[in-house]
């Protein structure tokens, strides 16, 4: 194959190089020649190659803010929920609760320490402004991960007081009751 072994990225043809052509496009390419291919075996190979390339991407570790070492609740978010979740965490900490917050910036691939971080806390809530796609994705990628979920599909940002109220209910409930 015409790939760099470490990165799995195809070599680029240098203009004028005999036997090579620089080809751009969205159609599936043959793994050996780079020519357009509709062969099913080649398609399988190329899909697996793309998945391997994505898995090799180095992303920063997932960081935890707040009471990172001994929180009773970890609040997990992604993207634009950061400010609202951080404000809710700070309000809960001001009330004396031990709370931490982790905000994903990368989800494919996940940070290498994802399972370690999520497995460290008694209760984890994934707060999303959708129907729970991140929670479902994390359950599929992290063995044994069963988070609580706070989902809103209103087309509006979270209201911090609603987050605080919901998270406080989780914190007050015994682990076996929630």
Task: Name each model feature, range by range.
Residues 1-178:
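Flexible, low-complexity linker and terminal segments
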């Amino acid at each position: 194959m015409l790939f760099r072994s470490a990165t799995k990225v195809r070599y680029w043809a240098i203009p004028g190089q005999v036997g090579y052509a620089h080809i751009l496009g969205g159609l599936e390419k043959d793994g050996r020649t780079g020519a357009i291919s509709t062969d099913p075996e080649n398609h399988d190979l190329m899909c697996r190659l793309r998945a391997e390339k994505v898995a090799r991407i180095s992303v920063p570790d997932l960081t935890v803010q707040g009471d990172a070492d001994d929180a009773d609740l970890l609040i997990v978010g992604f993207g634009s929920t950061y400010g609202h979740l951080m404000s809710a965490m700070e309000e809960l900490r001001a009330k004396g609760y031990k709370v931490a917050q982790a905000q994903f910036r990368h989800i494919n691939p996940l940070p290498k320490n994802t399972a370690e971080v999520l497995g460290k806390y008694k209760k984890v809530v994934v707060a999303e402004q959708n129907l729970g796609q991140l929670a479902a994705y994390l359950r599929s990628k992290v063995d044994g991960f069963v988070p609580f979920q706070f989902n809103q599909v209103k087309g509006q940002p979270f209201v911090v007081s609603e987050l605080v109220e919901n998270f406080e209910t989780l914190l007050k409930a015994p682990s076996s009751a929630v």
